[in-house]
Amino acid sequence: MKFLALAALFASTVSSIAVDGLIPGARVIPANDVVALKKVGAHHQKHPHRRTVIIRPSFNDEDDVSADFLWGIKWANRGGRLLLQKGKKYVIGKKLDLTFLKDIEVQLDGELKFTNDVPYWQANNFYYDFQKSISFWRWGGEDIKIFGSGVLNGNGQRWYNEFAGQEILDPNNKYYRPILFVTENATRVSVEGITQLNSPCWTNFFVRTKDISFNNVFIHAYSTNASALPKNTDGFDTLNVDGLTVTNTRVDIGDDCLSPKPNTTNVFVQNLWCNGTHGTSMGSIGQYPGVLDIIENVWIENVTLLNGENGARLKAWAGPNVGYGRINNVTYKNIHVENTDNPIVLDQCYFNINATQCAAYPSRVNFTNIVFENIYGTSSGKHGKVVADLTCSPNAVCSGIRLKNIHLTSPAGSPPVIVCDGIQGDIGVECQSSTNLTTKRSIGLARNLKYKA
């Protein structure tokens, strides 16, 4: 295998160290010479001059540089930076366990692209029991910073084509698709500036992670095949996470824009733009029998949601074999929706369960202290005049639900209808029960809608 030396530009201006042993041809630039790189990007605030590691790029889409990448990560670990250069592509074709990290930067200015070798990835991955999730790699440790102007490419089109017509939550589903970016047992992770493109499944999944932030990130999933949509490509999913911050981020994908899942606390979201999504969703939780799930202390502010199924949504499972828990202390503030089927929805009849089954086996997840403030814009009219559907289970508690300054309209006509069933106390606005004859036509198919994961 041939390895590239440093580009002539760097060779002429930067003294570098040839590293014997693992990866011939790679270079490590000492910390005192990093300043010579000048315009390659911003420096870590705490350590402005870091040793920088450069690895060779791929020659083509079949040239797997997984070993080079792992080598570079190890050399950059504990105080260094791995630089993935602008205009270069780095193909990853092997699963990577990166859970040993401490004080590392990865400057992604080029493109990191995964292979679409479906048989390999379905046999070689990191598996999570929660909703049968798999990943290409996993990042863990502490003080991890990923930044730059480059692209993390999941190369998802083949996965979209082959998964068409299937459902992720079908118990018989065996076609597992990798998640693009996973953290596990990680503390203080920062991601900034990059683009995440065409994940085969969820885009981000954070597991047993504390203090993770995303800023100025663009998440995009699109399909070139109109009959094979980029399904389940959620922007952000969490499991056992304390401290998630998402700011100044754009999401254009085929599922939840944001979806904190079981045992997630202390979430802050500000300046988020979502197009074509299933909304900013709390959950789903309560899926697994006998398991306690919690989502608590969430603040979501200044969000635009366009052309989607949902706006601000809470979702909990119902049925004969489900879990229990609570979603508590959640605020949605300054939320702008346009052409959205369900601008505000509390859904305690999730997933694929009709009204009769939900009444027989209601949810055991409590919704408490939920505030929707300054929610404005238009619904799609899919559910008639209904612009908010707040439906709680008789088995669960729904209290402290407050709506303030709601300015939503429907193309189906006026006045807009807010439906509330099973809510304890005053919600702050006029609402009607779904059993009221005057609202039944407005509600339309809302009660029987089968939401996707």
Swiss-Prot record:
Q: Which is a GO BP term held by this UniProt record?
A: pectin catabolic process
For this protein, what reaction is catalysed?
A: [(1->4)-alpha-D-galacturonosyl](n) + H2O = alpha-D-galacturonate + [(1->4)-alpha-D-galacturonosyl](n-1)
Q: Name one GO molecular function term.
A: polygalacturonase activity
Q: Which domain of life is it from?
A: Eukaryota
Q: Spell out the catalytic residues.
A: D255, H278
| Chief location of this protein within or outside the cell | secreted
Q: What is this protein called?
A: Probable exopolygalacturonase B
In which organism is this protein found?
Neosartorya fischeri (strain ATCC 1020 / DSM 3700 / CBS 544.65 / FGSC A1164 / JCM 1740 / NRRL 181 / WB 181)
